[in-house]
């Protein structure tokens, strides 16, 4: 490439995102517990909608996403005009950075927060500001102290990935109220459906004009392979995001499958209940053999080891047993492994394998 051809500032500072591993060399049918996927997959109704969509593949999709937006609004009690849909919640995050951040502005997030916050900030030339957490949990005071007149966006995953920890409504309200007037609080609710009774910040959005929420169909809805997400916020902000959204960013298959998925809340409830049961079981089983974790409110636990060497050695042992979990050194947690909550057999299998590893030490 010619020296005269250069990308915008910040682009070359982006480290390529690496998703959870899917395969282990020499191991057939390894069990993937590295990407926080729903072990039960999508709703049967969503699968039926997916198959029906093949009959209209020659047609362009809707540009306004009306069917999906209204379904989301009906289920959550929202104004459909204030719902925006994207290619995963990642795209909504990207839209927010494109619209509100840029050179000489700051984008704030916590030290163990989702990697896409940093990537999206750098992509628009903004300055990523990483704020320390307190025992792997969001520290509201630290976030507020990091805000300046340059702050434009504050991203907060609640529950957080990869820690699984979360803060309550009172702290969220205090954070929103304490931000500079020009800053938007973005509540990433990718794992919100795993928390009974949690509105992921919806009430806060109605009370304030500086809060936006993002959600995804990749987790409890089991549609990670389709890439569908959505956001909700003040009408003025959603209008801005729609101005930079591509007119055909979602296919008919994505739209109709996601609509069927969100309407099947019985499937969501079953998945949430099963996840809660086995998340508690796995955390307790690992704690008994000397592998603690913080209380997780998501569909994974963050297992803590004595040091980086032990975590990496355990990961290698699990791979020999056909089990794939996620190293999280990229999240500044090199002594930890993130383990997706699978079905009963998967949880028992991973607990047995880690117990076997600890006995060999």
Curated annotation (Swiss-Prot):
It catalyses: L-histidinol phosphate + 2-oxoglutarate = 3-(imidazol-4-yl)-2-oxopropyl phosphate + L-glutamate. Pathway: Amino-acid biosynthesis; L-histidine biosynthesis; L-histidine from 5-phospho-alpha-D-ribose 1-diphosphate: step 7/9. Its cofactor is pyridoxal 5'-phosphate. SUPFAM superfamilies: PLP-dependent transferases. GO terms for biological process: L-histidine biosynthetic process. One of its GO terms (molecular function) is histidinol-phosphate transaminase activity. The modification N6-(pyridoxal phosphate)lysine is found at residue 219. Homodimer. It comes from the Bacteria. This is Histidinol-phosphate aminotransferase. Belongs to the class-II pyridoxal-phosphate-dependent aminotransferase family. Histidinol-phosphate aminotransferase subfamily. Its EC number is 2.6.1.9. Keywords: Amino-acid biosynthesis, Aminotransferase, Histidine biosynthesis, Pyridoxal phosphate, Transferase. InterPro entries: Aminotransferase_I/II_large, HisP_aminotrans, HistidinolP_aminotransfase, PyrdxlP-dep_Trfase, PyrdxlP-dep_Trfase_major, PyrdxlP-dep_Trfase_small.
């Amino acid at each position: 490439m010619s020296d005269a051809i250069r990308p915008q500032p910040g682009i070359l500072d982006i480290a390529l995102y690496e998703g959870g591993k899917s395969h282990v060399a020499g191991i057939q049918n390894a069990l993937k517990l590295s990407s926080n996927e729903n072990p039960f997959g999508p709703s049967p109704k969503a699968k039926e909608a997916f198959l029906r969509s093949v009959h209209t593949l020659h047609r362009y999709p809707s540009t306004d996403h009306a069917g999906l937006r209204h379904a989301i609004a009906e289920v959550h009690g929202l104004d459909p005009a204030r719902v925006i849909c994207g290619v995963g919640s990642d795209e909504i995050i990207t839209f927010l950075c494109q619209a509100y951040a840029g050179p000489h502005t700051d984008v704030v997030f916590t030290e163990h927060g989702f990697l896409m916050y940093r990537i999206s900030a750098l992509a628009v030339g903004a300055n990523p500001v990483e704020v320390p957490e307190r025992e792997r949990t969001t520290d509201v005071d630290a976030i507020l102290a990091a805000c300046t007149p340059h702050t434009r966006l504050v991203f907060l995953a609640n529950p957080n990935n990869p820690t699984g920890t979360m803060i309550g409504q009172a702290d969220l309200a205090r954070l929103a109220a304490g931000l500079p007037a020009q800053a938007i609080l973005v509540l990433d609710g990718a794992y919100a459906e795993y928390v009974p009774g949690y509105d992921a910040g919806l009430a806060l959005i109605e009370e304030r004009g500086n809060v936006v929420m993002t959600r995804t169909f990749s987790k409890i809805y089991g549609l990670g392979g389709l890439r569908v997400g959505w956001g909700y916020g003040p009408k003025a902000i959603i209008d801005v995001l729609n101005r930079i959204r591509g007119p055909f960013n979602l296919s008919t298959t994505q739209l109709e499958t996601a609509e069927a998925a969100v309407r099947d809340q019985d499937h969501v409830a079953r998945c949430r209940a099963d996840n809660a049961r086995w998340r508690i079981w796995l955390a307790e089983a690992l704690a008994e053999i000397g592998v603690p974790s913080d209380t997780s409110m998501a569909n994974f636990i963050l297992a803590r080891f004595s040091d980086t060497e032990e975590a990496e050695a355990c990961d290698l042992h699990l791979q020999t047993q056909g089990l794939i979990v996620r190293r999280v050194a990229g999240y500044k947690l090199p002594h930890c492994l993130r383990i997706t909550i699978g079905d009963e057999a998967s949880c028992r299998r991973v607990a047995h394998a880690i117990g076997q590893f600890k006995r060999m030490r």
